[in-house]
Amino acid sequence: MRETILGNNIRKVPSVAVGCMRLSEKSKNEMNHFIHAALEQGAYFFDHADIYGGGMSESVFGEAFADDPSLKREDIYLQSKCGIRQGFYDLSKEHILKSVDGILKRLHTDYLDLLLLHRPDALVEPEEVAAAFDVLFESGKVRHFGVSNHKPMQIELLQKYVRQPLVVNQVQFSIPVSNLVANGMEVNMETPGSIDHDGSLLDYCRLHSITLQAWSPFQMPAWKGCFLGSDEYPELNKKLHVIAEKYNVSDTTI
């Protein structure tokens, strides 16, 4: 598994994180097999969130991991997210601290390697986020922090108060959802792609050593499902298949 540098040379992590959103209905045995299969491929970076499966994805993962003595906490990198509540987003100090305690309990661990704020809270009080992060960092419950789905100025606002560097921004990115790159190629053009919806997010993150993570990298725009094999992208799928055959791997691998 290839590795990439996280943030400003914090450490190396696998280039592919194992998404755990749809694992809530797995049995303990199935989850154990899932974890071992990932580790055998060098994929030791697991991405969770407190809302995945209503918390069950973390619970099943944590139970399977804790019950297998061959699995060691120091051999994996655990990331989770908080801030989404029923009907609104909440980045208050109280909610962040309560959420992390729940995450740690469900995952059967005493620390997270990385905590992300899942969505921007339009009513956020950045001082509360800073206070929560200080408590989590100083107690050893969270080692590094980041965000998800945030624009540059939202990150700037948080970073004005938060002492710890925000090292990750997880956003939707895939071949069909490639506006982060396309915007930069259509500057000063009268085309739909020239409209910058994200505030030069790609350039901002590169300038500030913030690692961009892609969520749902196989997904089409507007939550239409996977683009692999879709009739909406015949030329793309044909090209992917040609490349996959060349290297004797699956289209998904490419």
Range-by-range predicted roles:
Residues 3, 35, 58, 62-65, ...:
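Generic structural signal for well-ordered alpha-helices
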Residues 21-23, 49-52, 81-85, 117-120, ...:
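Active-site beta-loop-alpha junctions enriched in small/polar residues
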Residues 104-125:
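Active-site groove signature of glycoside hydrolases
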Residues 1-76, 138, 220-221:
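N-terminal binding-site loop/beta-alpha segment at the start of enzyme catalytic domains
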